Amino acid sequence: MRDIKTYLSVAPVLATLWFGSLAGLLIEINRLFPDALVFPFFSF
């Protein structure tokens, strides 16, 4: 039972950190390359 409580307290924190960092990354990409359908750093 203690393991379940530990999981339920850790999983939301990790999910919040992961989705927050992912959102920040997407925001920065859209700030550097606005309205880009094909990103310049993918085409070599």
From Swiss-Prot:
The chain crosses the membrane at residues 7-27. Keywords: Chloroplast, Membrane, Photosynthesis, Photosystem I, Plastid, Thylakoid, Transmembrane, Transmembrane helix. It is found in: Plastid, Chloroplast thylakoid membrane. Pfam families: PSI_PsaJ. One of its GO terms (biological process) is photosynthesis. InterPro entries: PSI_PsaJ, PSI_PsaJ_sf. One of its GO terms (cellular component) is chloroplast thylakoid membrane. SUPFAM superfamilies: Subunit IX of photosystem I reaction centre, PsaJ. Its main location: plastid. It is a single-pass membrane protein. The keyword Cell cycle does not apply. It comes from the Eukaryota. Belongs to the PsaJ family. May help in the organization of the PsaE and PsaF subunits. This is Photosystem I reaction center subunit IX. The lineage of its organism: Eukaryota, Viridiplantae, Streptophyta, Embryophyta, Tracheophyta. The gene is psaJ.
